Amino acid sequence: MARILGVDLPRNKRVEIALTYIYGIGRPRAAMICKQVGIPSELRTEGLTDEHIAKIRSIVEANFKVEGDLRREIGQSIKRLMDLNCFRGIRHRKGLPVRGQNTRSNARTRKGPKKTVANKKKAV
């Protein structure tokens, strides 16, 4: 099993798909990496040589911010927005959508499950 940047790549998947298991590498970047290394698109991870793995590792480390570094940078940028008390930071703090989406009827993913409120009792 190939291990790149602390991530075990699945053996039976194509290299292009297996690289997407690394946080910060999607399909386009994975295709670009495979092209730079010279790996055919149909090659599976189990068919990689140590030389291929070393080349992939060097390309990823040199050109991309991935895994812990990327997660840390994203977290710090969100924390910076929250410290600035700007609109986006306030939305992050309240757990609401940040990019202007409607919250009257949707946004359940961001807001979490419904919190039901009891009805008021009528006076007799």
Curated annotation (Swiss-Prot):
It comes from the Bacteria. Residues 107-124 have a biased composition (Basic residues). PROSITE patterns: RIBOSOMAL_S13_1 (PS00646), RIBOSOMAL_S13_2 (PS50159). GO terms for molecular function: rRNA binding; structural constituent of ribosome; tRNA binding. Disulfide bonds: none annotated. Located at the top of the head of the 30S subunit, it contacts several helices of the 16S rRNA. In the 70S ribosome it contacts the 23S rRNA (bridge B1a) and protein L5 of the 50S subunit (bridge B1b), connecting the 2 subunits; these bridges are implicated in subunit movement. Contacts the tRNAs in the A and P-sites. PANTHER family: 30S RIBOSOMAL PROTEIN S13/40S RIBOSOMAL PROTEIN S18, SMALL RIBOSOMAL SUBUNIT PROTEIN US13M. This is Small ribosomal subunit protein uS13. It comes from Bdellovibrio bacteriovorus (strain ATCC 15356 / DSM 50701 / NCIMB 9529 / HD100).
